Swiss-Prot record:
Multifunctional protein working as a cell cycle progression factor as well as a cell survival factor. Required for the progression from the G1 to the S phase. Anti-apoptotic protein which functions as a caspase-3 inhibitor. Has no phosphatase 2A (PP2A) inhibitor activity. Exhibits histone chaperone properties, stimulating core histones to assemble into a nucleosome. One of its GO terms (molecular function) is histone binding. The gene is ANP32B. It comes from Ovis aries. Its main location: nucleus. This is Acidic leucine-rich nuclear phosphoprotein 32 family member B.
Length: 261
């Protein structure tokens, strides 16, 4: 895929001004030059052109906010003066795997006042005697060369990233986490409300069961009392009948005695 088409795909319906990172690794550059990249990418902070067959960076547009440029595994042998002119705020530059042979080719980088990290792995220039001392002397603004400072201390991982880009990504991640936490909190609160409603329903059912039990018990007692009253009435009637029978018996006996007289 050629570089122009790759840039078009990477835009993803965005305007160039909305792009902050652009990765064009392994695409093809015609005549070894940058093409399709314009000054409209005014907010671009990270540009990667690894293994695209570049010979020259002369077509590089002015990118005032670019901080990190990846140019490793190309065929660049010079012409670095364009970098200082077009990328005034560049802090990280990777030229590893290019055809840079002597310290003189690096001299234009002196004008990159913000440059603090430079990588030249697998370039012939690294084979020169006193290579590191010479580069640090040539570029006093430099903090790290090939991942190490003047005292051979390794650069922290944070220095390998673009300042600002990562901070914004961290902010976005933080906002997403806060949003997720808020959503989780709302879900938990909703669950608690549901649990409370369920508890109230259970308590209501228990109260209803209790009332029903009391009514049922009361109902049984009432029926039992009515049965007892019926039995008492029957007994009273039997006693009255017996007394009536006894009275009639006495009357008959009295009548019989009168007849005998």
């Amino acid at each position: 895929m050629d570089m122009k088409r790759r840039i078009h795909l990477e835009l993803r319906n965005r305007t160039p001004a909305a792009v902050r990172e652009l990765v064009l690794d392994n695409c093809k550059s015609n005549d070894g030059k940058i093409e399709g990249l314009t000054a409209e990418f005014v907010n671009l902070e990270f540009l990667s052109l690894i293994n695209v067959g570049l010979i020259s960076v002369s077509n590089l547009p002015k990118l005032p906010k670019l901080k990190k440029l990846e140019l490793s595994d190309n065929r660049i042998c010079g012409g670095l003066d364009m970098l200082a002119e077009k990328l005034p705020n560049l802090t990280h530059l990777n030229l590893s795997g290019n055809k840079l042979k002597d310290i003189g080719t690096l001299e234009p980088l002196k004008k990159l006042e913000c440059l603090k990290s430079l990588d030249l792995f697998n370039c012939e220039v690294t084979n020169l005697n006193d290579y590191r001392e010479s580069v640090f002397k040539l570029l006093p603004q430099l903090t790290y060369l090939d991942g190490y400072d003047r005292e051979d201390r390794e650069a922290p991982d944070s220095d390998a990233e673009v300042d600002g880009v990562d901070e914004e990504e961290d902010d976005e991640e933080g906002e997403n986490e806060d949003k997720e936490e808020d959503e989780d909190g709302e879900e938990e609160e909703f669950d608690d409300e549901e649990d409370d409603d369920e508890d109230e329903d259970v308590e209501g059912e228990e109260d209803e069961d209790k009332v029903s039990g009391e009514e049922e018990e009361f109902g049984h007692d009432g029926e039992a009392d009515e049965d007892d009253e019926d039995e008492d009435e029957d007994e009273d009637e039997d006693e009255e009948e017996e007394e009536s029978g006894k009275g009639e018996g006495r009357k008959r006996e009295t009548d019989d005695e009168g007849e005998d007289d």
